[in-house]
Every structure is written in structure tokens, then in C-alpha cells.
Amino acid sequence: MIEEDALHKNQPHMDLSSKPIFLPSIAVLLFFACSGFLVPHIEAASGYSNLVYNSCANQTLTDPIESYSQTLSSLLGILTAKSLHSSFFKGSVGDDHAAFFGLFQCRGDLSNANCYNCVSRLPALSKRLCGESLGARVQLSGCYIQYEADGVAENSEPELLYKLCSETEAGGSGFEEMRTEAFAAVEMGVKSSGNNGFYQETSGEVNLMAQCQRDLDICECGECMTNAVQVAQEECKSSVSGQIYMGKGSLSYTFYPNGIPSTNSHHGTRFCFCFFSFLGHHD
């Protein structure tokens, strides 16, 4: 029996209309097919499967190994299947002899398809990175998975799980002011975004993204982001970019001194591919 808490998300609509191209026909039979498609915002469509970090429990599978392995495989299979329609799910699988609790979460700007593509990589990756550990957390840039066996002793792990600060530092171009302004909006933003704790904003030349674990209430989410901002300020200092991963939330920022690249996250860029077939006439 599995206990579940899933939150569903609608997949964004994409205009797939096509525009025909007309060319003159001179002594040839011209057949063409032209189809247009949209390339979504780069952050939402790519770069979500890069490994950020992983942590593995010290305890490993012991007798009965087969029972634990089967239970864990069942849990990972369920988490993967749920990611087809949800961006967050947590549940437990097993009985008194072998039970596992687990969850996954996808980044708030990923479509259902990209969420599934991201999560489906995690079972094999966690097996390769953590082997027979009774607990693991594997974080990709677009999603993460976490699981542990019932009865595994929890380490008093710090609130900060992982940080990555750019070695490049910003010069005197108003960076501190713009980043401070962006950080100031985070706590309120995750509370009022209406997007289940996901927040993305641009302040001047600073692009910022923040997300809380979906089972946090508004106050817990706000507190998590306040702590993440403090870590970013203390640890990343003047770095032009930083990624902060807390126990139940994440914060990232990037400073673009030459201006944020122009992208259209709603409509994407339209391309048209044409295929031609020429049938010539011979005398």
C-alpha cells in the first residue's frame, strides 16, 4: 500500500501552427512540406539533467537484501511514473520487514514531459552513485529524488546541503545593489507567486530563481528562503552567480553585466523546415 501526496500541474500550451511557403514552378513538379515549431525558453527546455550533487547514507543493505532491493525498486518505479503528471510526489512502500519512504520534485518551470525526462534518469543514477545505501539524495539541475529505509538513523545534517559560487567576481557596476534588491523580493515572492513555492524574477541585471519543497507551508517556505539568502550573501559574496541548496529549498542567481540575454519564455523562437522533391522532365 502506498500513501501519496501529489500535486498536479498543467502542461503549457504551445502554438504549433505552420506557415506554407510558395515557390514558382518552372518545368518541374515541386512538392514541399513546411512545418513550424516553437523552441521554448532555454531554461525550461534544456540543462535540467546535469548532476549538481549527491549524498548517500552510510548504512547499506543487509539481510534480507532481496526484500529491501525489491521494495526500493518499487518505490523508485512509482516516483518515476508519478512524474509523468506531477511535479512533486512523496510516499512510502513496503511492510514491517522492509519499507522505504521517498519523494521527488521538479523545478517549477519544467513541463510535465521535461519533469518526467529528468526524474526518469534518477533511479539508475542513484544506484550508480550510492549503490546499496539505505538512503540517498540525488540533485539534478531540474529535479531531485530522496529516499530512505524505515528505521535508518537520521544524521543531524546541516540546513545547507550544497553551495556553488562562481569564481568570477562582479566589478563596480551596481551588482551589490541589484542582487540585494532581488534577494529582498524572494521571501515575499515565494509566498505570493501562486506557483507552489516557485519564484523567478529579474532585477536589473540579476536573474534569480527560488523554490521550496512543495509540502512546506508559506511561513516555512519564507523562512527557508531567508536562510538561503543569508548563505548566498555570506558564502558567495561578490560572485557573479551562485547556487544554494538547503534541506527543503533552493536559491540561484546570475548577474549579467552586459544585460540579460533577450529570450521569449512564452512564445519561443519560430523555425521552419522545408522539404522539397523535384521531379524533372527529360526529352
Report each predicted region and the residues it spans.
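Extracellular secretory-pathway ectodomains and N-terminal mature segments of eukaryotic proteins
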Residues: 2-283
